[in-house]
């Protein structure tokens, strides 16, 4: 087998650009910068907010309510 064909696998520091958190891992890259980590991601922190805009189900329910109301008046 050939020797020295694989990149060096070393200890690197991962730094979060959002909160500044850093931790150690191993990689072939010299350093890793991430946008969001588990310390500041809304899913992991429990600060997740759901943005509920009128979706297709809500639109259907509104139309269905109107049609049942108009059918009840027609009888």
UniProtKB/Swiss-Prot annotation:
Gene Ontology CC terms: ribonucleoprotein complex; ribosome
Entry's transmembrane regions: none
Xref: PROSITE patterns: RIBOSOMAL_L31
Alphabetized UniProt keyword annotations: Ribonucleoprotein, Ribosomal protein, RNA-binding, rRNA-binding
Cystine connections: none
GO biological process, one term: translation
InterPro entries from the UniProt entry: Ribosomal_bL28/bL31-like_sf, Ribosomal_bL31, Ribosomal_bL31_A, Ribosomal_bL31_sf
GO molecular function: rRNA binding; structural constituent of ribosome
Self-association state and partner proteins as the record states: Part of the 50S ribosomal subunit.
Family statement drawn from the similarity comment of this UniProt entry: Belongs to the bacterial ribosomal protein bL31 family. Type A subfamily.
Function per UniProt: Binds the 23S rRNA.
Name of protein: Large ribosomal subunit protein bL31
Gene: rpmE
């Amino acid at each position: 087998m050939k020797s020295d064909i694989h990149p060096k696998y070393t200890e690197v520091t991962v730094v979060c650009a959002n909160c500044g958190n850093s931790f150690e891992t191993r990689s072939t890259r010299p350093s890793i910068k991430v946008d969001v980590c588990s310390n500041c991601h809304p899913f992991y922190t429990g600060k997740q907010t759901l943005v509920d805009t009128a979706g297709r189900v809500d639109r259907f329910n509104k139309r269905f309510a109107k049609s049942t109301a108009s059918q009840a008046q027609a009888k």
